[in-house]
Amino acid sequence: MNPWQRFARQRLARSRWNRDPAALDPADTPAFEQAWQRQCHMEQTIVARVPEGDIPAALLENIAASLAIWLDEGDFAPPERAAIVRHHARLELAFADIARQAPQPDLSTVQAWYLRHQTQFMRPEQRLTRHLLLTVDNDREAVHQRILGLYRQINASRDAFAPLAQRHSHCPSALEEGRLGWISRGLLYPQLETALFSLAENALSLPIASELGWHLLWCEAIRPAAPMEPQQALESARDYLWQQSQQRHQRQWLEQMISRQPGLCG
């Protein structure tokens, strides 16, 4: 049995039965073997679409990172790990090739779908934001007193934010005078997001504590939620329908492949 097959057996058993293949309950073994044979055959058929050859280094790195936890749990030598990563990279390339064969949605389909779902195409509320961070090593209270001093200076004059952020902030945004740009929900730590989206325009937050340290946020401007421009919305609708078409085409291809070739793996 080659490395990717051993890896697939191990991953299947651990993900579905929470144990190694050799430790499966005898009552579960038939179901495991049936699932394994099906998966093995599918993977063999899929990778056959992609000839052995050069695989982009970036793809190999991404695959290695995504499989790292599973690979670390197995007893695989470095050459075996490399073979497993290459196998999964070929799977990715094959699925991408299958997806490219899916029919693209025509303009009338996109327009009709967009008209039925216009309420989904909203630009979210955003805040033009600046950020100042003082990280904490040991004396949290001393850092708290420092950021209170910075808060008082900025609260007296917003013009003080840029030079103080450049001089004192431990956030990479210090290089841009604290600028984070337009921020939507879901991009910041929860406590920072809550504080930012409760601020009025041009308001400064009180110091906010997080696991990183103490923060100040300045909401320079507010851009309310609004409908997307029609052209942008149509492009988003097309992208969504195209993605759905690709996924549907991949599923149909797999179903046809399984029904035609019920082969086994050794």
Curated annotation (Swiss-Prot):
EC assignment: 5.2.1.8
Domain (PpiC): residue spans on this chain: 124-221
Keyword set includes Nucleotide-binding: no
Enzyme class: isomerase
Pfam short name (any one): Rotamase
Domain of life of the native organism: Bacteria
SUPFAM superfamilies named among the record's database cross-references: FKBP-like (SSF54534)
Catalytic activity: [protein]-peptidylproline (omega=180) = [protein]-peptidylproline (omega=0)
Recorded GO MF terms: peptidyl-prolyl cis-trans isomerase activity
Keywords, comma-separated and alphabetical: Isomerase, Nitrogen fixation, Rotamase
GO biological process terms held by the UniProt record: nitrogen fixation
NCBIfam families: nifM_nitrog
Family the UniProt entry places it in: Belongs to the PpiC/parvulin rotamase family.
Job of this protein: Required for the activation and stabilization of the iron-component (NifH) of nitrogenase. Probable PPIase.
Name the record gives this protein: Putative peptidyl-prolyl cis-trans isomerase NifM
Native source species: Klebsiella pneumoniae
Lineage: Bacteria, Pseudomonadati, Pseudomonadota, Gammaproteobacteria, Enterobacterales
Gene name of this polypeptide: nifM
